[in-house]
């Protein structure tokens, strides 16, 4: 943990030290011509000291998990002033490009401390990292097992569909062949029945047994031949019940407890009415009883 922490803290510390030394040297070189070098040194150390003090306080707050925008703003202000001093000095020198190349060091140091602070707020202990890795690995394992299971189920379903389709095709072929054979047999029977000598031959055979029967021969009938029952006589004369009459009958069946029982008893009594009318009458009667 400490080793990983130093990976972000060490660059920030090194950049801060270089920028502070550079700032002091530039201030002494720049202001030493107009004032004693001791005064210029004090000015440079004061600028660096203020920046270092705000940085130390900001790091103290970060260690407690706190944050102060005012302190952060003051720290960026010191960094901006130091950068401004370096830029102003570079513009007055003959080799301005070389000085401008290092004028960004104070702001870079401040940015590195910002990155280090962000890393600290998101840093985790090795135990937590191990747990996260275990959770991720477990999720990957479950996803792989689910994908394999889906692929296996898909393969099984494809095999089943192919088997069902093949069986259906075989059944269809057998049915087609059977239908063709039946059609051929019926055609042969029909030709035999319609033949000129068929009726004569059957008449000769059956005349001794049933002399009065007509000489006819019909194809056998396949399936049940129950006669359709005749319609009830006088059903057209039945007068349908009115809503009031249905309500009167259903009011006597309220004690049945449910509509199905009441409807069954209604029909057992010999009455007839549509399902919709019975349901509407039941609702009306039950509302009246409830009221």
Swiss-Prot record:
It is found in: Cell membrane. One of its GO terms (cellular component) is plasma membrane. Keywords: Cell membrane, Membrane, Plasmid, Transmembrane, Transmembrane helix. The chain crosses the membrane at residues 24-44, 71-91, 99-119. It is a multi-pass membrane protein. It comes from the Bacteria. Involved in plasmid transfer. This is Protein SpdB.
């Amino acid at each position: 943990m400490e080793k990983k922490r130093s990976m972000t803290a060490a660059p920030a510390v090194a950049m801060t030290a270089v920028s502070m030394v550079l700032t002091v040297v530039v201030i002494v070189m720049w202001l030493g011509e107009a004032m004693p070098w001791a005064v210029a040194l004090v000015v440079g150390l004061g600028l660096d000291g203020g920046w270092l003090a705000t940085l130390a306080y900001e790091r103290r707050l970060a260690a407690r998990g706190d944050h102060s925008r005012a302190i952060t703003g003051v720290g960026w202000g010191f960094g901006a002033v130091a950068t401004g001093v370096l830029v102003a000095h570079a513009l007055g020198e003959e080799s301005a490009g070389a000085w401008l190349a290092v004028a960004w060091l104070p702001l870079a140091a401040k940015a590195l401390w910002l990155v280090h602070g962000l890393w600290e707020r998101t840093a985790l202990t090795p135990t937590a990292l191990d747990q996260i890795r275990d959770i991720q690995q477990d999720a990957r394992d479950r996803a792989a097992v689910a994908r394999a299971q889906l692929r296996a189920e898909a393969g099984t379903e494809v095999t089943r569909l192919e088997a069902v389709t093949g069986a259906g095709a075989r059944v269809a072929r057998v049915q087609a062949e059977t239908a063709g054979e039946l059609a051929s047999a019926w055609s042969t029977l029909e030709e035999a029945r319609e033949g000129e000598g068929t009726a004569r031959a059957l008449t000769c055979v059956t005349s001794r047994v049933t002399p009065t029967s007509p000489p006819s021969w019909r194809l056998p009938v396949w399936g049940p031949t129950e006669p359709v029952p005749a319609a009830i006589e006088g059903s057209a004369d039945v007068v349908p019940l009115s809503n009031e009459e249905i309500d009167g009958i259903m009011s006597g069946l309220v004690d049945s407890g449910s509509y199905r029982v009441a409807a069954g008893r209604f029909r057992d009594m010999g009455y007839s009415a549509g399902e919709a009318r019975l349901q509407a009458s039941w609702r009306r009667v039950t509302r009246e009883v409830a009221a």
